[in-house]
Amino acid sequence: MSNFVTLIEPLELTGSRVLRIAVAFAALCGATGLLAFSWWIYKQSSSKPTLPYPVVGDTHAQSLEKNLIKGMQQYRDSPFFLAGSRPPLLILPMSVFHEIHNMPNEYISIIVEHEDKFQGKYTHITTIRPEIPATIRQDLTRNMPNIILELQDELTYASDQWPRTSKWSSVSLYDMMLRTVALLSGRAFVGLPLCRDEGWLQASIGYTVQCVSIRDQLFTWSPVLRPIIGPFLPSVRSVRRHLRFAAEIMAPLISQALQDEKQHRADTLLADQTEGRGTFISWLLRHLPEELRTPEQVGLDQMLVSFAAIHTTTMALTKVVWELVKRPEYIEPLRTEMQDVFGPDAVSPDICINKEALSRLHKLDSFIREVQRWCPSTFVTPSRRVMKSMTLSNGIKLQRGTSIAFPAHAIHMSEETPTFSPDFSSDFENPSPRIFDGFRYLNLRSIKGQGSQHQAATTGPDYLIFNHGKHACPGRFFAISEIKMILIELLAKYDFRLEDGKPGPELMRVGTETRLDTKAGLEMRRR
């Protein structure tokens, strides 16, 4: 009997191994089948569909900039699909811009489109509720004079962390600007002392960085696999951690803000003084229904505002500085303008920056606007999803499920756009849009009746960096003020130059977007 048991034990062990191998093999087959099916779905969705409009350009191009310009030249007044875009992107003529942008979300939705594009399930970027734009438009922008004073104080604190030596030293420009923008934005959104708290800084910056990472990582996978892979990405776990942290931080601040509101509701003067401190939380709560005045909702709103403010503003600011470094002939005219506006205090720690002074820096404003045109973050306006098949007033048919956008960059680079036409004005030579002219918009503003137009924060059908109409970026006035203030500090107190033997980073063009080498360094010294 014992011999029989001795003989059967190896068989049991062998059977166990066989079972494990069989299970592993079945799992492998299942995974392989799922991958094969997902790949088939992906190929079907990314293959060239049968479309009612022409597909323009090289389908294998890394950058779709040339495809867009080519399509605009061939089909300026009719739709075309942008070759190489995923999903296929229908570019519409500007003649239907206002008709499209005035449609309700039930017909044309940016939320549904961005749910896919920005992986809203994991980033929550597409869960922006109406309280955020309402707070920005009605409170933040209206209180800019007071906020600018707060930002200047924060800029003094932030710039103390910049190089202090009068000798040339190499710095990572993007990292330096990222931290500076995060500090200034935090001063407006959460106020002192939280805006300087290292944990809050890392959370607001980290949320921004990880959201971009999630979008880029999941974009490389088939839509079928994204729900399987997404929850396991380290960046997704990081976003959840940042949101939990934000909720914990917001809880006592919400309680304090609600208590202050109740205590001072009848005291208009004190309420106005409280507003002047620039805290975003008390404003935000006024636009939230009572059931959503929770730490989780306010924490999410704060992270969403941080994403919009920190990521885009840092990129825009970094591009402006790089263009100044590459085009040093603009530096002295900008410094001279600063001296004209601020007088001897232009290089003094006691310089007083206010809204009126910022508005008088026409050359700086023009340079910022031209860099935005020359180095856009995207070649098209924010895309939207057609929710119902329809026929537009001029006969253009749109199919349900189609992604649509307008050719912003092609408009900015075309002489057929009136603003960029050589014949736009007889008072000065209007350079081709293919040429960088930092004072282009300074000249345009000199035309009679154009003085209040062509500013860095203004929009129009010929300038779509911030979109246009009711969907124009509500935070653009805050962002441009922030950029100007940081540039004033740089120009007044620092010299900067390219590192020896390095040309400076070139704008990388990928799909419909552009990217910048965030690790590139420049040399700077205290003046």
From Swiss-Prot:
GO BP term, example: gibberellin biosynthetic process
Entry GO CC: membrane
Pfam families, sorted: p450 (PF00067)
Keywords for this protein: Heme, Iron, Membrane, Metal-binding, Monooxygenase, Oxidoreductase, Transmembrane, Transmembrane helix
Bridged cysteine pairs (disulfide): none
Keyword Transferase: no
Top enzyme category: oxidoreductase
Induction notes from the record: Expression is induced under gibberellin-producing conditions.
Transmembrane segments: 21-41
Protein purpose: Gibberellin 13-hydroxylase; part of the gene cluster that mediates the biosynthesis of gibberellins (GAs), diterpenoids that may provide a selective advantage during infection of the preferred host plant, rice. Gibberellins (GAs) are diterpenoids and are synthesized via the mevalonate pathway. Biosynthesis of the major metabolite GA3 (gibberellic acid) from geranylgeranyl diphosphate (GGPP) requires 13 steps.
Sequence similarity: Belongs to the cytochrome P450 family.
Protein name per Swiss-Prot or TrEMBL: Cytochrome P450 monooygenase 3
UniProt gene name: P450-3
